[in-house]
Amino acid sequence: MVGIIVKDGESIESALKRFKRDCANAGIMSEIKRREYFEKPSIKKKKAIESAKRKAEKKKRLFSKKDKA
């Protein structure tokens, strides 16, 4: 849970900015968007497999460029 303590003499705008930054760093908004709708386990698995394939292809391209140089 993200929380901040407003310092003496601190404006509301700067406290709100710190709170939003802490929320972004904690990944709260991305988690809310991910959980907005129910996702079947089969769809989750399919997305994970696709993500792994993309990462492997990216890694393969990265290392093939290093070998050529």
From Swiss-Prot:
A Pfam family in this protein?
Ribosomal_S21
Asked whether the UniProt record includes Ribosomal protein among its keywords, one would answer yes
Gene3D superfamilies for the chain: Ribosomal protein S8
Gene Ontology cellular-component annotations: ribonucleoprotein complex; ribosome
Keywords attached to this entry: Ribonucleoprotein, Ribosomal protein
One biological-process term from Gene Ontology?
Answer: translation
Q: Which GO terms describe its molecular function?
A: structural constituent of ribosome
Q: Which family is this sequence assigned to?
A: Belongs to the bacterial ribosomal protein bS21 family.
Q: What is this protein called?
A: Small ribosomal subunit protein bS21
Gene source species: Leptospira interrogans serogroup Icterohaemorrhagiae serovar Lai (strain 56601)
